[in-house]
Amino acid sequence: MIPLDRLRQITERFQYLEAAMAAGDGAADIAALAKEYSDLRPVVEQISAYQQLLSDLEDAAEMLGDPDMAPLAEEEIPRLKSALPQAEAALQLALLPKDKADAKPAMLEIRPGTGGDEAALFAGDLFRMYQRYAETQGWKVDLIELQETELGGIKEVVAHIKGADVFARLKYESGVHRVQRVPSTESGGRIHTSAATVAVLPEAEDVDIHIDANDLRIDTMRSSGAGGQHVNTTDSAVRITHLPTGLVVTSSEKSQHRNREIAMQVLKARLYDLERSRVDDERSADRAAQVGSGDRSERIRTYNFPQGRMTDHRINLTLYRLDAVLQGDLDEIIDALTAHAQAQLMADMGQ
């Protein structure tokens, strides 16, 4: 059942915002008003479409009492009634609580798990998969930290991804990704299983998270290249430790000033993510509105090379086009995960 009082409140708020922006009072707040107005517009459009449909149905029902108009009404009413469920579903979707982080840029972190060199190679495959997907979306990917292995794998990669709805599209990628394949170093042709962990964090702004300078320990050290050799002769790498949580962030570009900026950016994102997780836990002990448990240690997906298969275990989705997926063709997976999360939210709201 759609709450009519809420529809009225949203419409009245939208009209107020429209009038406030037209008046131009309080110029400092115009940006905030415009943002809220923009967020409400698609909701109000769905409300208008739904209310128009109800109004048309009411008019058609009245026409049944007019002998001249009754044939037209009898033809129109079934069409209007058949359109009603779709309009209700679209409106319910528009009314779902919005994650304010959805429009934010994101930090992507990938680290190998069990599996040694093969896990590091798989971590590299995953990073390239996300890079290719970002290209298809027109997003910008900036590398923050990259530690490679001698075989071309990745020990750790941290990247900043900026563009439209980055976090909304990538947030369900967090978790353990498992690969089953024959390693190139395996002479016996045996299939090995290894894993890598992906974390996608929304970028945090100062308004999102406050960090007390007294809670930080900042160390400088020599940057190291492959094999551990020093890549310059000055102390440029920066390590920041957040003492209350024990979180440690490092950055090792050539500029110490830039390293400090990058490390703080990553630290803010991780602390913001911790706070979001804490709030989510308080709101829903069973995390019913999330895809999976939301736990980064949860195995979310398996990439089976011998079968050319990708399976997402949270929604039991299996695709037999692994090559395309690893080339960045992720929309079908992401759309299915998003739809599943929305369906869970709707069910949760209906309880």
UniProtKB/Swiss-Prot annotation:
Compartment(s) of residence: Cytoplasm
Keyword Protein biosynthesis: yes
PROSITE patterns in alphabetical order: RF_PROK_I
Main location: cytoplasm
Gene3D superfamilies associated with the record: 3.30.160.20, 3.30.70.1660, 6.10.140.1950
GO MF annotation terms: translation release factor activity, codon specific
Keywords tagged on the record: Cytoplasm, Methylation, Protein biosynthesis
A Gene Ontology term for the protein's cellular component: cytoplasm
Modified residues annotated as N5-methylglutamine in this record: Q229
InterPro entries: PCRF (IPR005139), Pep_chain_release_fac_I (IPR000352), Pep_chain_release_fac_I_sf (IPR045853), Prokaryotic/Mito_RF (IPR050057), RF-1 (IPR004373)
Post-translational modification: Methylated by PrmC. Methylation increases the termination efficiency of RF1.
Region ranges (Disordered): 278-297
Record family assignment: Belongs to the prokaryotic/mitochondrial release factor family.
Function summary: Peptide chain release factor 1 directs the termination of translation in response to the peptide chain termination codons UAG and UAA.
Record's protein name: Peptide chain release factor 1
Protein's organism: Roseobacter denitrificans (strain ATCC 33942 / OCh 114) (Erythrobacter sp. (strain OCh 114))
